[in-house]
Amino acid sequence: MPRSKSSHRWLKEHFDDEYVKRAQQEGYRSRAVYKLQEIQERDRLLRQGMTVVDLGAAPGGWTQYAAGLVGKHGRVVASDILPMDPLPGVTIVEGDFREAEVLERLLAVLGEGGADLVMSDMAPNMSGMDAVDQPRAMYLAELAAELARTVLKPGGDFLVKLFQGAEFDEYVRMLRTEYDKVSIRKPKASRPRSREVYAVARGRKVV
């Protein structure tokens, strides 16, 4: 099947992308690592000894970066419905955490201590139709927020990918009721024409 003009354009942009080239040169699994790196430089979410849950982790760029910063006394639990190659010091929970068995495995790995940080870079497969894509994206963000409610320690932090559009404002308002401080970040590595942003929610409130 011949490729469409849009897919040709995407491929050209992908291989010309400075962040794709950097990721290849620096041994990271995806360009997405530079979004997290920029957020980290500004917000200092990741620290030595932390327990981190990474949702939508495959292929593992964020997981790699987080594991390097939490160090040998910290741990990263990576969750995705897609298979993911192992990484040193990382526990991978493969499967859909909406399913009870997968969620139980995830909770068992974390134990009673819970998590200091939940990160979600989850996004739906985009159709190009906003009326379809935006509800799917917000649904994934809701799932991530619900998991954060379950596993975060009091005072813990939550980082989540969002797309500006329907339900965005309501979601951010919800975060502000549950966390002490919420900021919106648009990393330079996020493609300019994308409506993708990240919400940084600090200090999970005790309910």
Curated annotation (Swiss-Prot):
Keyword Cytoplasm found: yes
Active-site residues, as the UniProt record annotates them: 161 (proton acceptor)
Residues annotated for S-adenosyl-L-methionine binding in this entry: 60, 62, 80, 96, 121
Keywords tagged on the record: Cytoplasm, Methyltransferase, rRNA processing, S-adenosyl-L-methionine, Transferase
Pfam families with a match to the protein in the record: FtsJ
Molecular function via GO: rRNA (uridine-2'-O-)-methyltransferase activity
Annotated EC: 2.1.1.166
Record localization: Cytoplasm
Catalytic activity: uridine(2552) in 23S rRNA + S-adenosyl-L-methionine = 2'-O-methyluridine(2552) in 23S rRNA + S-adenosyl-L-homocysteine + H(+)
Cited InterPro entries: RNA_methyltr_RlmE (IPR050082), RNA_MeTrfase_FtsJ_dom (IPR002877), rRNA-MeTfrase_E (IPR015507), SAM-dependent_MTases_sf (IPR029063)
GO cellular component: cytoplasm
HAMAP family tied to this protein: RNA_methyltr_E
Protein role: Specifically methylates the uridine in position 2552 of 23S rRNA at the 2'-O position of the ribose in the fully assembled 50S ribosomal subunit.
Family designation: Belongs to the class I-like SAM-binding methyltransferase superfamily. RNA methyltransferase RlmE family.
UniProt name for this protein: Ribosomal RNA large subunit methyltransferase E
